[in-house]
Amino acid sequence: MNQSDNLVKTWLLGYVDAWDQFWFTPRLPHALSILRIITGVMLLYSHLVLATDLSAFLGDTAWVNNETARQLHDGTFGLSDYGRTYLWFISSPTLLWIHHGFTIAVTACFALGLLTRITSPLAWFLQLMYLHRLTGTLFGFDQILTYMAMYLMLAPSGSCYSVDAWLRKRFASTDRGRFWNWLFPEAKATVLANIATRLMQLHLCVIYLFGGISKARGQTWWDGTAVWYSVSNYEYQSLDMTWLSGYPRVFSAMTHITLFWEIFYCALVWPRLTRPFVITLAVVVHAGIALALGMITFGIMMIAANMIFISPGWVQHIVVRLRRRSQQDDG
């Protein structure tokens, strides 16, 4: 009995240790900082696109006006949800432009890594307000941007490859207190960086799992024609791939491989043995979506999201090598 108790105790302690190691082992922020740059640039691009015809998206004269947008969330047309935004109540074009200019400025600072501790939560909050207002004009690109911005604000994503890092180095000789150290954190391993990384990894696994299960409900994913129907659809087609019609075994294999990969991504991405193959396939799939189906921004963001499984030490090594090569070329 004592031996059995010891075995159970050892197993439980091992489980607790593994849990602690998974969540609370300090991690370098370098991969998160690269993701901050990509997410910030794509957020900036998204807001600049809105600025090309702002009145068509926001205000009382928009395609979906303020009142209709509010009713889509408050239960008028169905179940009420928690999607709320103050943009429902702004009708003045001047105020909307001032607000949008502020949003663009904040997003640009977030991308550059300027006052990231402040601009990262602001960029996420403003994006969420737009997300709740623009019901009916959203796509997966917007959702991926929002969840990545949400987790990046939890971590010191501006501690390297940023204006914040330059400012900290520039004034390194002066000890300015706790607030300064919080505002301009060092590029060192932290628990928060690891927690943000794990949350992003798990979120991505959930996205792929439910995406794969949803695909499995469709007959075309079982009979092998889903990829063909996708690339032959003129509504999305940006690259003529109709030549695949002459190779049914090819597009059938592509269909079944994609379905298998998406459903089992959440299991196969964790072991080091299978991770390179899973990530490589993710790049191939999303690059194909970007080039063949015209969803370039979505493809870029999904490839970027998969970077969260790349070791920050490896990212740091690559950046250092690129800098050295650049310096050698300049010399």
State where each predicted segment sits.
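Alpha-helical membrane-anchoring segments
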Residues: 1-331
